[in-house]
Amino acid sequence: MSADAAAGAPLPRLCCLEKGPNGYGFHLHGEKGKVGQYIRLVEPGSPAEKAGLLAGDRLVEVNGENVEKETHQQVVSRIRAALNAVRLLVVDPDTDEQFRKLGVQIRGELLRAQAGPEQAGPPAAPGEQGPAGENEPREVEKSHPERRELRPRLCAMKKGPNGYGFNLHSDKSRPGQFIRAVDPDSPAEASGLREQDRIVEVNGVCVEGKQHGDVVTAIKAGGDEAKLLVVDKETDEFFKKCKVVPSSEHLNGPLPEPFTNGEIQKNNPETLAPAASESPRPALARSASSDTSEELASQDSPKKEDSTAPSSTSSSSDPILDFSISLAVAKERAHQKRSSRRAPQMDWSEKKELFSNL
């Protein structure tokens, strides 16, 4: 009997949203004394409003997964994991109450089974793309261009009674300033800001390489409004492969291509060229030897090593003879300092030797 009664009851709605520049445009919250997550506010002209989402709707499924018993943060994480598009199965309060009285659990299968003949009715508004069964392959088809178009996001927010509602921190393992946490129902959450996002620009000014205090100061300088250009981890890695700093031009403009070998080969010599031009000879010395102490030695140390190396192989070259009698020469110089007046006698003997050689 419950199935027959459910056939005449209003149906849940499947709302397919595509993220816009300011996010999806709805606020999610939990109500005291009630189980589940509810739509608190739908912004005018937003993707949520166009998809047919209504304030007061209860969220049943996110991308085909039941979320009725999940916490607020778990539901938010599921929605964020959907990248730029999400499918929400929702029910309005009247429909929710009728299904509870009938003892029927709301599921996506119920919508597919009973909504087919009634697609011309009210449920057709959020599902203009076709029945729920047809939406799934289309979403799969969209997943490929979404991955190719990894773009930064512009999160515009106005300060509320408790501030913007996000925490900023720096990660020792990665350069930059990151979003550590986003408070539920905060201006930051409404703007589409996500945990682990990296801030690229603050109010149109690039903050790449800035310290934590500088970024905080830039945000505070905006007064009660802030526009943060951010990238998630995947988008950040994409732009790093392209060796391009994300900017507001990449919100809708052309994206760089990271997977061409030509670009990588052009960029690599630029980074290696300064090191090679500054000290080419030490670079060759490092490649020829695995001894790390050579890197800290001066240019005189290789000369000593070059001179000592052949000493064990030959004894006919003059430099080696000089090194072999270095102690004797030192002693002679010491004696010469002590008895410098006896030097002329040595000069006469040297002159005789020179004359004989000539």
Curated annotation (Swiss-Prot):
Quaternary context: Homodimer, and heterodimer with NHERF2. Binds the N-termini of EZR, RDX and MSN. Binds the C-termini of PDGFRA, PDGFRB, ADRB2, NOS2 and CFTR. Binds ARHGAP17, EPI64, RACK1, OPRK1, GNAQ, CTNNB1 and PLCB3. Binds PDZK1. Interacts with CLCN3. Binds the C-terminus of PAG1. In resting T-cells, part of a PAG1-NHERF1-MSN complex which is disrupted upon TCR activation. Forms a complex with CFTR and SLC4A7. Forms a complex with SLC4A7 and ATP6V1B1. Interacts with TRPC4 (via the PDZ-binding domain). Directly interacts with HTR4.
Source superkingdom: Eukaryota
UniProt tissue specificity: Detected in ileum, duodenum and in kidney, where it is found in the glomerulus, the proximal tubule, the thick ascending limb of Henle's loop and the cortical collecting duct.
Its job: Scaffold protein that connects plasma membrane proteins with members of the ezrin/moesin/radixin family and thereby helps to link them to the actin cytoskeleton and to regulate their surface expression. Necessary for recycling of internalized ADRB2. Was first known to play a role in the regulation of the activity and subcellular location of SLC9A3. Necessary for cAMP-mediated phosphorylation and inhibition of SLC9A3. Involved in sperm capacitation. May participate in the regulation of the chloride and bicarbonate homeostasis in spermatozoa. May enhance Wnt signaling.
Modified residues (Phosphothreonine): 292
N-acetylserine: modified positions: 2
UniProt feature coiled coil, ranges: none
The protein's name in its UniProt record: Na(+)/H(+) exchange regulatory cofactor NHE-RF1
Membrane topology classification: Peripheral membrane protein
Biased composition (Basic and acidic residues): 135-151, 348-358
InterPro entries: EBP50_C (IPR015098), NHER (IPR051067), NHERF-1/NHERF-2 (IPR017300), PDZ (IPR001478), PDZ_sf (IPR036034)
Species, as recorded: Oryctolagus cuniculus
Pfam family, one: EBP50_C
GO biological process assignments: bile acid secretion; glutathione transport; negative regulation of cell motility; negative regulation of phosphatidylinositol 3-kinase/protein kinase B signal transduction; negative regulation of platelet-derived growth factor receptor signaling pathway; protein localization to plasma membrane; regulation of protein kinase activity; renal absorption
Record domain PDZ: where: 14-94, 154-234
Description of post-translational modifications: Phosphorylated on serine residues.
Amino acid composition bias (Low complexity), ranges on this chain: 114-134, 272-290, 308-327
Region ranges (Disordered): 114-151, 247-358
